[in-house]
Amino acid sequence: MKRFLLAAVGLSGVGILPASGGCLAAGLPDTALDRARVLLAVQELEITLLTHPSATVALEDWCASHHMADRPVVVARKMIPTGPDPVPARVRADLGASATQPIRHRQVQLVCGTHVLSVADNWYVPDRLTADMNATLDGTDAAFGHVVAGLHFSRDRLEFTRLWSPWPGSPHDTAGVITPPAQIVRQRAVLRDARGQPFSEVVETYTDQTLSFMPARDADYAH
């Protein structure tokens, strides 16, 4: 069974991330050239995320362009909070919600094929979605971005942080292979409908499994 670790994902949310180690293609050597290759992949991931209002669509494009699954469809693997789950005050403020207005918290791993590409904490105001949208979120593993696509939403980014860079690397690393940590990039954002009304706040942490498509050095890179 795959091991998991807990990692804070901002605000008071907690996401479950796959343990790091071995997600990058086995055998990718720890050289300047290969670290540069990984850095380019991280930068490409950031550009993909920054140019899509929907993280779901961004990850499906990423999964498809890097041939990471036969069917590049992202599904939301739900996680159940194990303790008290109060809505952070900052989320209520960002969403313009009163202290008594219902806000739901959906915590998921976004999965494409066998790859857990991100973990996401999503607080949303059910009164600002349709009844069908709420039923789908409650009863299926559909990703949030697909469910609320009919709102024609935009993304107001509040945070976008690179959590790890392969460059220049540690001079004390003697393992001989590049081993990213579990967390690569994090973003926090408010989603707004076509009228500009906020309906959701998300904290998304993108994992080292976004890089698992990278091949070990081969003839294409040897010359």
Residue ranges with predicted function:
Residues 19-22, 208:
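Generic secondary-structure boundary signal with a strong preference for alpha-helix termini
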Residues 7-19:
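Bacterial N-terminal signal peptides
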Residues 22-105, 109-111, 115-169, 175-180, ...:
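N-terminal domain-onset segments
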Residues 185-192:
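Low-complexity, intrinsically disordered Gly/Pro/Thr-rich segments
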Residues 1-4:
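Positively charged n-region of N-terminal signal peptides that target proteins for export
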Residues 203-209:
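Surface-exposed flexible segments
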